[in-house]
Design a protein with these regions (language model features):
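N-terminal beta1-alpha1 ligand-phosphate binding loop
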Residues: 1-11
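FMN-binding flavodoxin-like domain, especially the glycine-rich phosphate-binding loop
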Residues: 9, 13, 17-18, 25-108
Length: 108
């Protein structure tokens, strides 16, 4: 999907959240997509319920065709876990988006 494409283009170490049962014990940035009409994907909700203490920020993918729900999962996570929503990207992003996201990651 779009998030996998972003990760592949960033060429960074990443933990793929497929079930939500994954664990992480170091600081991390979450890159996720927005599900449905502004929802946090269920496996991401489950992952965050047990792995939010090291969460430092969220980068979110969305589709502007959804209007006000565009990238809303990032806003929901930011509010729920009191972390910044660092970047919103349309689908899998442009090269400029990837460069900006890379800078954000390098500055964490």
């Amino acid at each position: 999907g779009n998030v996998q494409s972003i990760i592949d283009r960033l060429n960074v170490d990443a933990l793929e959240i497929s079930s939500g049962a994954e664990t992480i014990s170091e600081d991390y940035l979450l890159i996720t997509y927005t599900d449905g009409y502004g929802d946090v994907p269920s496996e991401v909700e489950e992952f965050l319920s047990g792995n939010n203490s090291h969460l430092k920020g969220v980068i979110v993918s969305g589709d502007q065709g959804y209007g006000e729900a565009y990238c809303k999962a990032g806003d929901v996570i930011a509010k729920q876990y009191n972390v910044p929503c660092l970047y919103k990207v349309e689908n899998d992003g442009t090269e400029e988006d990837i460069d900006e996201i890379r800078k954000i990651i390098e500055n964490q």
